[in-house]
UniProtKB/Swiss-Prot annotation:
This is DNA mismatch repair protein MutS. Keywords: ATP-binding, DNA damage, DNA repair, DNA-binding, Nucleotide-binding. Belongs to the DNA mismatch repair MutS family. ATP binds at G622, P623, N624, M625, A626, G627, K628, S629. CDD domains: ABC_MutS1 (cd03284). One of its GO terms (cellular component) is cytosol. The gene is mutS. This protein is involved in the repair of mismatches in DNA. It is possible that it carries out the mismatch recognition step. This protein has a weak ATPase activity. GO terms for biological process: mismatch repair. GO terms for molecular function: ATP binding; ATP-dependent DNA damage sensor activity; damaged DNA binding; mismatched DNA binding. It comes from the Bacteria. Pfam families: MutS_I, MutS_II, MutS_III, MutS_IV, MutS_V.
Length: 872
């Protein structure tokens, strides 16, 4: 190392502290990367890889670099690739230092710690999540959005609950204890950590005393109890890992992270990963797009922070009637007063993302434009408060109280920062005239000096008679007089030559040099003073961060309420009655998303009645494409919307609180976990049967179709019986099936009812009426659906022939079903499993044909007679 240059020694010393990050090493106007970092970064960023002086072993040192003033898109590309970036700045002025300039890493940017708005999706959070579990079954989970300051923590009972919550949060980066790599936990977590940036924290961090000290240090001496985290155990360790990581990466700058929000699953309607996916709450199943999801429909918010809160409300519906009613009252007030709603939306339209502005200001990464955006946002609040002043809604009054316009802060920014400041702080032109006397004086000197230069140029042109004479400036020579070579004979004696060019000479004079020193000195001082004054203003704004955060949260909530009111008004939704009973009644319910996406068609509404009495389990039969899945999903979505506090797509609705919504809708192979379609289906079903309660809502679509017919109907039958007979798990259930045999359950189970999707037959065609009617379906209409799907006519005709054989119970003499032989086949086909719909008479005939009555003992004959009796 002694053979290395001082700069490379400094680089390697700093790099040693950040081995897992790409080090952006500031050299003048560039960030340089060396060695392995350079090789990796050049490949990801598609920039030139070069080399510089050889290192101690004689090899070239790989090198690449980017301009510091345009680093943002390059950093974003590295973060998107899952890399971490350590920003190493010069912390001394090179002009005032002899030798190597001192450098330090000022922050580390990771996928979970992005704060630059240009690298973030406005209506999506960017979470860093920490997960911890000791030898017990309780998992601690905390997550932070550094860009907004939102910090939450919970404890979850069991691995499945922890995995479900990680899937709901959708973090960009996850923090895990280093010991997880050794004790097998990492392998368990692979399905949820795949594709995530993962950081392992040293095990010593998970020490209770250290955790309490770290929490107290970050939150101004507050204890976990004072922060509302009393009673947490594993959750404290999850918090500690996040704070430790912040300390390591942000160098103490995270003052806007000033509170923790503890929560439990009991506070919200529980939705597992499968349910969120199947109901397409925030993304579509097919493409993973926002458009076409419930969020895509409901989000009419004006602000980015309102959009993020809307998603949070959808992911975490409420289970407290008071909170739901408060939201309903606020929405109803806006529905009934459209002019006030319109005025509110207009004012919100001028509000920037206060949460993320507040975050950048706290992290000292905000520019002057950010301060102006905050000023303009806060300036809208008096008008909003005036609109809310007459509200009768408890929630709207509370939100109004939480809004603080901070007039002194608005005045400070308005008086200190120009209306349209430049992006680059060091360029100057940020501070308004009249804000600082010294700055005003320096600007006057600068303006006067520039005026002098213009007058001097005119004077010299007159004195020399050289009309082409120019006074110019560059960073190397400062101000100079440029004269073309054709005019050199007219040069005065007091001109001092500075530089010879091909077609001109450059000169200075003592008078020009004197004014140069005065003007340039003033401009340097102006830039320094402006930056210092800007930092003072930004620091003052930082001190109001907690108030700004509360105000931003109130504005986001208002935005969501106005959005839900707009949706209710536009789509003619009703206010549901929500209580703590056992009834789920919906009159003329519609699927919110499908109705909105097919506005040219009339959506057929349907009624629903579920309870814990005579209508606990509804079996729904009918052909594919008739609308069974749509109906069941709409019931689940209406229930969820009601518990969000939203109005719902129906003419009337009475929704008793549910604790969980389960869905078993469709399936696909999970090759990553080595699970087949049927295995996925059975695992989801098992989860439902373990956790469903009488207060749950269960949606089951085609249980058992991933295996043989007899296996499938047996499983479906047993699942239905379990949900009916087991009082502990007797959830309100919608059960769609193609197994018509399941309709027999209504005969023996008093709380099971049969319904089907009405279909009209006409000229061998079917028309789906989309209406749910009482009773089981008489036909499956599979062949008609196949015709609609475009199967070849030959296949359709053969299917009809086979169906007739099945319905008549026709078999060949050797017991092989006639469906095994087509018209063109020859020879005997191997025996196959009989259809579920084989006639009982044929089964009886086969049994009789296969027995030898001459060899039966009396006891065997009696047993056989009993068996035959049961068969008929």
């Amino acid at each position: 190392m002694s053979q290395l240059t001082p700069m490379m020694r400094q680089y390697l010393e700093i790099k040693a502290g950040y081995p897992d990050a790409i080090l952006f090493f500031r050299l003048g106007d560039f960030y340089e990367m060396f060695l392995d970092d350079a090789v990796k970064a050049s490949r990801i960023l598609d920039i030139t890889l070069t080399s510089r002086n050889k290192n101690s072993d004689g090899a070239d040192v790989p090198l690449c670099g980017i301009p510091y003033h345009s680093a943002t898109p390059y950093i974003a590309k590295l973060i998107e690739a899952g890399e971490k970036v350590a920003i190493c700045e010069q912390v001394e002025d090179p002009k005032s230092v002899k030798g190597i300039v001192r450098r330090e890493v000022v922050k580390v940017i990771t996928p979970g710690l992005v704060v630059d708005s240009s690298n973030l999706s406005p209506k999506e959070n960017n979470y860093l999540l920490s997960l911890y579990c000791d030898d017990a079954t309780t998992w601690g989970l905390s997550y932070l959005d550094l860009s907004t300051g939102e910090f939450r923590v919970t404890e979850l009972d069991g691995f499945d609950a922890a995995v479900a919550e990680v899937a709901c949060v959708k973090p960009r980066e996850i923090i895990l204890p280093a010991v997880f790599r050794e004790n097998g936990r990492m392998k368990e977590l692979m399905p949820v950590t795949a594709g995530l940036a993962t950081t392992f924290v040293d095990d010593w961090v998970y020490d209770l005393d250290y955790c309490k000290r770290l929490i107290g240090s970050h939150f101004g001496g507050a204890s976990p109890s004072a922060l509302g985290c009393d009673g947490l155990n594993t959750g404290l360790y999850a918090i500690c890992a996040v704070l430790h990581y912040l300390q390591e990466t942000q160098k103490g700058r995270a003052g806007h992270v000033n509170s923790i929000i503890p929560y439990t699953n009991r506070e919200y309607l529980v939705l597992d990963e499968s349910t969120r996916r199947n109901l397409e709450l925030t993304a579509t199943l097919a493409e993973g797009k926002r458009k076409g999801s419930l969020l895509g429909l409901m989000d009419r918010t004006t602000t980015a922070m309102g959009g993020r809160k809307m998603k949070q409300w959808i992911n975490y519906p409420l289970v407290t009637i008071q909170s739901i009613t408060e939201r309903q009252d606020a929405i109803e007030e806006f529905v009934q007063d459209p002019s006030r709603r319109t005025a509110l939306v207009f004012l919100l339209n001028g509000v920037y993302d206060l949460e993320r502005l507040n975050g950048r200001i706290s992290l000292a990464s905000a520019g002057a434009k950010d301060l102006v955006a905050m000023k303009e946002s806060l300036a809208r609040i008096p008008g909003i408060k005036e609109l809310l002043a007459s509200s009768s809604s408890v929630l709207l009054r509370r939100l109004n109280e939480g809004l603080n316009p901070l007039p002194d802060l608005v005045g400070l920014i308005a008086g200190g920062i120009v209306e349209n400041p430049p992006f680059v702080l060091r360029d100057g032109g940020i501070i308004a005239d009249g804000y600082n006397a010294e700055l005003d004086e320096l600007r006057a000197i600068s303006r006067e000096g520039k005026g002098f230069i213009a007058r001097l140029e005119a004077q010299e042109k007159g004195r020399t008679g050289i009309n082409s004479l120019k006074i110019r400036y560059n960073k190397v020579f400062g101000y100079y007089i440029e004269v073309t070579k054709t005019n050199l004979t007219s040069i005065p004696a007091d001109y001092i030559r500075k530089q010879t060019l091909a077609n001109a000479e450059r000169y200075i004079t003592p008078e020009l040099k004197e004014y140069e020193d005065k003007v340039l000195g003033a401009e340097d001082r102006i830039r320094e003073l402006e930056f210092s004054l800007f930092q003072e203003i930004r620091e003052t704004v930082t001190g109001h961060g907690e108030i700004v955060a509360r105000t931003a949260d109130c504005l986001a909530t208002l935005d969501v309420l106005a959005s839900l009111a707009e949706l209710a008004h536009e789509r003619n939704y009703c206010r549901p009655l929500v209580d703590d009973g056992t009834t789920l009644f919906i009159s003329e319910g519609r699927h919110p998303v499908i109705e909105a996406m097919h506005q040219g068609e009339r959506f057929v509404p349907n009624d629903t009645l579920l309870d814990n009495g005579e209508n606990q389990l509804i079996i729904i039969t009918g052909p594919n494409m008739a609308g069974k899945s749509t109906f069941m999903r709409q019931v689940a979505l209406i229930t969820l919307m009601a518990q969000m506090g939203s109005f719902v797509p129906a003419t009337e609705a009475h929704i008793s609180l549910v604790d969980r919504i389960f869905t078993r809708v469709g399936a696909s192979d999970n090759l990553a976990r080595g699970q087949s379609t049927f295995m996925v289906e059975m695992m989801e079903s098992a989860n439902i049967l373990r956790h469903a309660t009488p207060k749950s809502l269960v949606i089951l679509d085609e249980i058992g179709r991933g295996t043989s017919t007899f296996d499938g109907v047996s499983i479906a039958w047993a699942v239905a019986e379990f949900l009916h007979d087991n009082d502990k798990h007797a959830a309100k259930t919608l059960f769609a099936t193609h197994y018509h045999e399941l309709t027999e359950l209504a005969v023996t189970r008093k709380r099971i009812k049969n319904f089907n999707i009405a279909v009209k037959e006409w000229n061998e065609q079917i028309i789906f009426l989309r209406k749910i009617v009482s009773g089981g379906a008489s036909h499956s209409y599979g062949i008609q659906v196949a015709r609609l799907a475009g199967l070849p006519l030959e296949v359709i005709e053969r299917a009809k022939e086979i169906l007739q054989n099945l319905e008549k119970g026709e078999f060949a003499e050797e017991g092989i079903p006639r469906i095994a032989r087509g018209k063109k086949s020859a020879g005997s086909a191997p025996a196959s499993q009989l259809s579920l719909f084989d006639s009982g008479e044929d089964m009886l005939r086969k049994r009789l044909k296969g027995m030898d009555v001459t060899t039966l003992t009396p006891l065997e004959a009696l047993n056989l007679l009993d068996e035959l009796k049961r068969m008929v």
